[in-house]
């Protein structure tokens, strides 16, 4: 008698959570293996699935932005992880941000209650047997025994970079007589808290960052500290130049406190506008917790408190969580993976998420969707699917499987990954809109493969 179809998913981060759900939705039994809380990672704080360890934001909502287009594609494909993000969204201007505690708890409960999902809390130290259909979604913090087995299997050393998380403060400890609520260019409903700096305050703050003591990074060569450019520590930005932070996370443009006067008065605007602005984004549904946007850091915790309390409005800030830095591991995917996310040398083994070399939450979810869908199809005796390269989700999987291998580095969603449009469109907004329209149209055949959308 033939065995019932079955898939194993290793890792219950964003990619693994999505992959396990897609397998179960296809009617295939799935075992989801997660090492937390048996073994903790350097960056996680809970044992819930799909824990967001860096920001609580999935990026821009608008579908004429790269991150927003990817989110919209995933909604149309029936993504549990993105649908649940919509359910547990918190105000964030034009971005999709979530109450991370409630969000992860809802996803954990959804999988725990699904009759086709078996959850095993243990550390997987080896790749499963070759005949077992498996999704590898252990993420950039894959435990060392499994990482070593993966190196033996691929015959290649893994790649790595260093990532960091931002601090979080209690909202009621922010001084709103100094800080003010607003969204950049008044987009949204004043969803951010903004801490303005004059030039003297900014320069003193930068100097303090440069002089602050950093925490020691363990288990790596200090001469090979590669950072991901999209998530640089704030102290690294400070080192790169006097104005680097002002043109990055501390840019003041588009932010105005009505207490300064009439923004339409040119003289008032010139006299009162901030030299730099630190933004805080709501972290939870109730607005009690706020994270410092773009303030990934590896400073020692005592130094973080000392330096960050120099920010106007944060002089008495109470820190719920300090920033941390950790090593992220990823595969040399162009040498190893097909666009279906199957390993070339073992088609029953698929990879998903940041370990494949994509960057960003939505990109991890997209990889989980495709790997889970294809694992289920393999279990059912069907051919795996390949997403169109004209879609953002497909462009990412084609990139990680087909990119030049020299110095392969993680890639976030961006319109530069998409094939050229048939016609040249000079206006950027119109061009991005055309990319969106083509992507969503080309995605339509994939939607027929999916059952009804469900959210937690």
From Swiss-Prot:
Principal location listed in the UniProt entry: cytoplasm
Cofactor(s) listed: FAD
Enzyme superclass (EC): transferase
Disulfide bonds listed in the record: none
UniProt keywords, alphabetically: Cytoplasm, FAD, Flavoprotein, Methyltransferase, NAD, NADP, Transferase, tRNA processing
Gene Ontology terms, MF aspect: flavin adenine dinucleotide binding; tRNA (uracil(54)-C5)-methyltransferase activity, 5,10-methylenetetrahydrofolate-dependent
Subcellular localization, as worded in the UniProt entry: Cytoplasm
Short name of any one Pfam family annotated for the protein: GIDA
EC id: 2.1.1.74
GO-annotated biological processes: tRNA methylation; tRNA wobble uridine modification
GO cellular component: a single term: cytosol
Residues that, per the record, bind FAD: 11-16
Catalytic activity: uridine(54) in tRNA + (6R)-5,10-methylene-5,6,7,8-tetrahydrofolate + NADH + H(+) = 5-methyluridine(54) in tRNA + (6S)-5,6,7,8-tetrahydrofolate + NAD(+); uridine(54) in tRNA + (6R)-5,10-methylene-5,6,7,8-tetrahydrofolate + NADPH + H(+) = 5-methyluridine(54) in tRNA + (6S)-5,6,7,8-tetrahydrofolate + NADP(+)
The keyword Protein biosynthesis appears for this protein: no
UniProt superkingdom: Bacteria
PANTHER family the record matches: GLUCOSE INHIBITED DIVISION PROTEIN A (PTHR11806), METHYLENETETRAHYDROFOLATE--TRNA-(URACIL-5-)-METHYLTRANSFERASE TRMFO (PTHR11806:SF2)
Known function: Catalyzes the folate-dependent formation of 5-methyl-uridine at position 54 (M-5-U54) in all tRNAs.
Family membership: Belongs to the MnmG family. TrmFO subfamily.
Protein name as catalogued: Methylenetetrahydrofolate--tRNA-(uracil-5-)-methyltransferase TrmFO
Lineage: Bacteria, Bacillati, Cyanobacteriota, Cyanophyceae, Synechococcales
């Amino acid at each position: 008698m033939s065995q019932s179809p079955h898939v194993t998913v290793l890792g219950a981060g964003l990619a693994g959570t999505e992959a396990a759900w897609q397998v179960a939705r296809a009617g295939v039994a799935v075992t989801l293996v997660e090492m937390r809380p048996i073994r903790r990672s350097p960056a996680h704080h809970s044992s819930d699935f799909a824990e967001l360890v860096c920001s609580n934001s999935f990026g821009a909502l608008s579908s004429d932005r790269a991150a927003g287009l990817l989110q919209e594609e995933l909604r149309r494909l029936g993504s549990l992880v993105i649908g649940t993000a919509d359910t547990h969204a918190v105000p964030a201007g034009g971005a999709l941000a979530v109450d991370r505690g409630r969000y992860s708890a809802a996803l954990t409960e959804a999988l725990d209650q699904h009759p086709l999902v078996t959850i095993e809390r243990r550390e997987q130290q080896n790749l499963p047997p070759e005949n077992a259909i498996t999704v590898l979604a252990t993420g950039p913090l894959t435990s060392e025994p499994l990482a070593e087995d993966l190196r033996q299997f691929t015959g290649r050393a893994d790649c790595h970079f260093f990532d960091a998380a931002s601090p979080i403060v209690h909202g009621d400890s922010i001084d709103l007589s100094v800080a003010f609520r607003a969204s950049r260019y008044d987009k949204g409903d004043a969803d951010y808290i903004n801490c303005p700096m004059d030039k003297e305050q900014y320069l003193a703050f930068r100097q303090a960052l440069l002089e602050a003591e950093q925490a020691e990074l363990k288990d790596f060569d200090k001469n090979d500290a590669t950072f991901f450019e999209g998530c640089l520590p704030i102290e690294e930005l400070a080192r790169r130049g006097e104005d680097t932070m002002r043109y990055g996370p501390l840019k003041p443009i588009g932010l105005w406190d009505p207490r300064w006067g009439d923004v339409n008065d040119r003289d008032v605007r010139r006299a009162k506008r901030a030299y730099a602005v630190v933004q805080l984004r709501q972290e939870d549904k109730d607005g009690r917790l706020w994270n410092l946007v773009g303030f990934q850091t590896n400073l020692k915790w005592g130094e973080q408190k000392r330096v960050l309390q120099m920010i106007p409005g944060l002089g008495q800030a109470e820190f719920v969580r300090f920033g941390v830095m950790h090593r992220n591991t990823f595969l040399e995917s162009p040498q190893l993976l097909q666009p279906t996310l199957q390993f070339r040398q073992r088609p029953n083994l698929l990879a998903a998420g940041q370990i494949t070399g994509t960057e960003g939450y939505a990109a991890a979810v997209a990889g989980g969707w495709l790997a889970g869908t294809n694992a289920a199809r393999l279990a059912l005796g069907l051919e795996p699917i390949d997403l169109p390269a004209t879609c953002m989700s497909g462009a990412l999987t084609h990139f990680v499987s087909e990119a030049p291998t020299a110095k392969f580095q993680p890639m976030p969603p961006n319109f530069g990954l998409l094939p050229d449009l048939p016609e040249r469109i000079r206006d950027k907004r119109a061009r991005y809109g055309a990319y969106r329209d083509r992507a969503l149209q080309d995605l339509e055949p994939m939607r027929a493969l999916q059952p009804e959308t469900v959210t937690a």
